[in-house]
Each structure stands twice: as C-alpha cells, then as structure tokens.
Swiss-Prot record:
Segments passing through the bilayer: none
Entry keywords, A to Z: Protein biosynthesis, Transferase
Residues that bind (6S)-5,6,7,8-tetrahydrofolate: 113-116
PANTHER family the record matches: METHIONYL-TRNA FORMYLTRANSFERASE, METHIONYL-TRNA FORMYLTRANSFERASE, MITOCHONDRIAL
Primary role: Attaches a formyl group to the free amino group of methionyl-tRNA(fMet). The formyl group appears to play a dual role in the initiator identity of N-formylmethionyl-tRNA by promoting its recognition by IF2 and preventing the misappropriation of this tRNA by the elongation apparatus.
This protein's name: Methionyl-tRNA formyltransferase
Gene3D superfamilies: Formyl transferase, C-terminal domain (3.10.25.10), Formyl transferase, N-terminal domain (3.40.50.170)
Family classification: Belongs to the Fmt family.
EC numbers on record: 2.1.2.9
GO molecular function: methionyl-tRNA formyltransferase activity
Top-level division of the source organism's lineage: Bacteria
Pfam family, one: Formyl_trans_N
Length: 319
C-alpha cells in the first residue's frame, strides 16, 4: 500500500474520524492532525474535543488546532512536518494557496457527492432533499476554489428510499474511506491523473438552517418526506402547535383521495397508532415519530395518548 507517503490529516467531525481510523487501520504514516479548536458542548457547555482530536490523541499523533491558517506563523507547523500530501475531510477551515502548495503532492479532499453536483457545505442532505436517486464520493486535488479542483477518484452510490442524513453519511464515510486509501496508493505509485469538472453541471449545497426545517403544508408530501429524512439528525423537521415546536423524526408521503379535495393543506385527516396524517398541497404526510421540547423521541401512539386533543380530525395546523 502507500506506506511511503507521509500524510497530514485535517478534519473535525465523526465523518472525518471514520477516514482517519481507516488510514490508521491500514498503517498509513500520519505525521500530524489538524482539527478545529475545542468548542463548548452539551448542557454544561464544557469544552469538548472533536472526534478527530479524540482519535488522534488515542494514537499519540500530534494535534494542531489553529483558529485559521491565514498567517505565516500558523502555516509554519505544516511546513515543518514536511508531508508528501495533506488529506482534508470536513475540516472546516479555508486552506490558503500557500498551504495547498506546501505538501509535495499538494492537498486532496474527500467530498461526499458526485462533483460538480452539490459543491459546498451540506452535500449529503441536499441530495436527499432534492430527491436525487444517487450520490457518491469524489476525491479531488484541492485548489483555491470551493470544491472546484480536478477529480482524482469518483464512486457512485444509490440513495435508498428510507435513507436519512445520518444513514447516508455513515454509508458515504465508509465508501470515502476505502476510496481515499486507493487514491493514496495510486498517488504513491505516480499513477493518479485528475479530471476537470464540468462547470455547466454545478449545483451548490448551501448550509442547512433551522428556518427551512419547518414543515410547510403548502408543499407536496413527497418533498416534506424528503425534508424529514434529509434533516435527520440536524436541524430536524418540525411544526408548531399551541406555541410548541414539535420535531418530526419520521414520516411517509401518501396519496390523498377525492374526498379531501375540498379541504385546505394542513388539515388533520387521521390520527391513530399508525401515524398522524396531514393534508398537503399534493398528497398526505403521515408522521410517525415525534419529539416534544426537552423530551425523548416517541411514537405517534404515545404522542396521541398525551396530546390527543391537539389532533382532532378536521383541525387546521399552521405552516
């Protein structure tokens, strides 16, 4: 394998840690790890290590946590490591051109989409949200643009009808880890050649927001179902009733019937152990798993046992 390559790894969340673990499991030479500074987390707001820092510390790998890489002083540690390549996976900091030029073979990035589709911050979730039938992983040679570099390795992966943001991320992390190792092997052998991206096919995966997670009954049920799946585990789709935010963790789109054509979107059609059914502009959304503020996730049946009066047949929910 590519044991001869000296690697700097840059990443922060669980998705990144999966890739680092795979490299370590295959005895890759990791000179150092760059990750985001420790952040307050949890109810106590105590400083917490990133998943990548936790893993690196367990393996006694030097950890660097600059707030930016814009100054020469901050870049010196990369230069001092004298790496062959820098592997970047969901790091969260911009890499200036000076940094991109430092490793002998430059910097490569693992991006969980089929570039140039879904460049940007939330490619996994946007693929589900848009109703894509497939996605994948692209490993690219980094340049100064946003996910615009030449593609080194690309693998297609089907999106299942029940995939969520969480489940698809786990699948693509496993796929990306394998592809990364293959890419490094080919780079070490001098057999890797890049392919330019087709700018005409570019789409952008903008950051997710809590505002867009609110369910709008004026949209089709099929789209709302995709939102529920895409926004799991964050920011989580929700609706508001009696001034309370109710998160929806699971829902299915269903066809409506002729008998409801006179009703307005947002109308409660049915509420039982199988779910709470709400009419939309096109079809019915059957919601089956919920979470009240500060509470655990519960089934529709448990929700109705405590809040049945909220979902009387014919009641109108606000968008």
């Amino acid at each position: 394998m590519s044991e001869s390559l000296k690697i700097i790894f840059a990443g922060t969340p669980d998705f990144s840690a999966c890739h680092l673990q795979h490299l370590l499991s295959h005895r890759q030479k990791i000179l150092g790890v760059f990750t985001q500074p420790d952040r307050p987390a949890g109810r106590g707001k105590k400083l917490a290590f990133s998943p990548v820092k936790i893993l690196a510390t367990q393996h006694h790998i030097p950890v660097y946590q600059p707030h930016s890489l814009g100054l020469k002083e901050e870049q010196q540690s990369i230069l001092d490591l004298d790496a062959d390549v820098m592997v970047v996976v969901a790091y969260g900091l911009l890499l200036p051109q000076a940094v991109l030029n430092m490793p002998r073979l430059g910097c490569i990035n693992v991006h969980p989409s089929l570039l140039p589709r879904w460049r940007g911050a939330a490619p996994i979730q946007r693929a589900i949200w848009a109703g894509d039938q497939e996605t994948g992983v692209t490993i690219m040679q980094m340049d100064s643009g946003l996910d615009t570099g030449n593609m080194l390795y690309k693998t297609v992966y089907p999106i299942q009808p029940d995939d969520t943001g969480a489940s698809l991320q786990a699948k693509l992390a496993a796929l990306g880890s394998q592809d990364l190792l293959l890419t490094l092997k080919k780079m070490a052998e001098g057999k890797m050649h890049g392919e330019t991206q087709d700018e005409q096919k570019t789409t952008y995966a903008h950051k997710l927001t809590k505002k867009e997670a609110r369910l709008d009954w004026l949209l089709p049920a099929a789209h709302l179902e995709r939102c529920v799946r895409a926004f799991n585990p964050w920011p989580v789709s929700y609706f508001i009733i009696n001034e309370q935010i109710i998160k929806v963790w699971e829902a299915q789109a269903m066809p409506d019937s002729q008998q409801v054509s006179h009703l307005q979107p947002g109308t409660v059609l049915k509420a039982d152990k199988n779910g709470i059914q709400i009419l939309t502009s096109e079809g019915v959304l059957n919601m089956t798993k919920f979470q009240l503020p500060g509470k655990k996730i519960i089934s529709a049946w448990d929700f109705l046992n405590s809040r049945n009066e909220w979902f009387q047949i014919g009641k109108q929910l606000l968008s």
